[in-house]
Amino acid sequence: MPKPGIMDIHAYVGGKSKVEGIAHPVKLSSNENILGSSDKAKDAYRNAVDRLHIYPDGKANFLRAAVAERYKLEPERLTFGDGSDEIFALLCQVYLEPGDNIVQGEHGFAAYAIGARACQGEVRMAKEVNHRVDIDEVIKCVDERTRLVFIANPANPTGTWLTGEEIRALHAALPPSVVLVLDGAYAEFCSDPHFEDGLELARTAENVIVTRTFSKIHGLAALRVGWGYAPEHIIAPIERIRPPFNTSIPAQEAAVAALFDDDFQDRSRALVEQWRPWLAQQLGGLGLEVTPSAANFVLATFPTTPGKTAPEAEAFLASKGYLVRAVGNYNLPHAIRITIGLEEQNRAVVELLSQFMGR
């Protein structure tokens, strides 16, 4: 029999990628990079095919040195995962005993809770205000059994963000025994001058880890590469239990190439910065409530009127070949999340939703 509670965990459900009767739907359901991947990363991936019979470097030293160089970090304070999801799970394994708890926002990313519950930990959901993490509510949830506080900044699936000042205030209010996990999967898309990526806080504090991913702005979601930066006393136990060959040779090579492809990153960021406000404005004009976003997607809240609901909107768009994400499993039953697409895709989504809303 599995451990108590394992079969009570709701498995992670990703964005839909197929729709019956439509051969090639437009996928705007998983916050992938709509531009694809860096050509330099693709070349690096192809150049690695002659080494498929070789185990990868378990310490990912080539990638480690590249990330350290790019972000001016100490290489010994880095860990690498099969996506940043694996790092979240490893943190839970390192820090949680049965009955311990994690704290996250009420609309927080599902992987945090899955990792905690797999370790027989409890999950405390802090109330959010306007889909935004409220640091006072987070602090209220912390008690003597709290071991980890997970904050995605910007957040998924809402797109909201906290300023550097707010993150520092939250950290200052936490007991030293609680590790603050700052998930920066979408950090590259945030242009707010008051936003901070958390790396400096992780450099100076004893209980902060920042995680990043190559899945979003770098367009390498299929390769599953994430990294974390923290004090060595946090990294060391993760390294003790981390699977030994968890990032493949092609993944490491492609990630290094992507990391230094500034042109691809700039184009990816520019597309989002151009079409995110446009899409938000257009959806607002249809009578939908759009949450301010600093990520590569927008969250739109629909009426509860039969025929105009979020699940019905998701189904309508799918019937026309456009896949978006209803987020009822994130305690947002009236909302859908839409990845920023190419111009023609964004315009098509607005036109279809205009039809759906009867405008």
Swiss-Prot record:
Pathway assignment: Amino-acid biosynthesis; L-histidine biosynthesis; L-histidine from 5-phospho-alpha-D-ribose 1-diphosphate: step 7/9
Give the Gene Ontology MF terms in alphabetical order: histidinol-phosphate transaminase activity; pyridoxal phosphate binding
Q: Where are the transmembrane segments?
A: none
Claim: rRNA processing is one of the keywords in the record:
no
Instruction: Look up the EC number in the record and give it.
Output: 2.6.1.9
Gene Ontology process terms (BP) = L-histidine biosynthetic process
Which UniProt keywords are given for this protein, alphabetically ordered? Answer: Amino-acid biosynthesis, Aminotransferase, Histidine biosynthesis, Pyridoxal phosphate, Transferase
Reactions that this protein is recorded to catalyse: L-histidinol phosphate + 2-oxoglutarate = 3-(imidazol-4-yl)-2-oxopropyl phosphate + L-glutamate
Q: Which cofactor does it need?
A: pyridoxal 5'-phosphate
Query: Record's CDD domains?
Result: AAT_like (cd00609)
Q: What InterPro entries does UniProt report for this protein, alphabetically?
A: Aminotransferase_I/II_large, HisP_aminotrans, HistidinolP_aminotransfase, PyrdxlP-dep_Trfase, PyrdxlP-dep_Trfase_major, PyrdxlP-dep_Trfase_small
Check the record and name the NCBIfam families matching this protein: hisC
Q: What does the subunit comment say? A: Homodimer.
Q: What is this protein called?
A: Histidinol-phosphate aminotransferase 1
Q: Which organism is it from?
A: Caulobacter vibrioides (strain ATCC 19089 / CIP 103742 / CB 15)
Gene symbol here is: hisC1
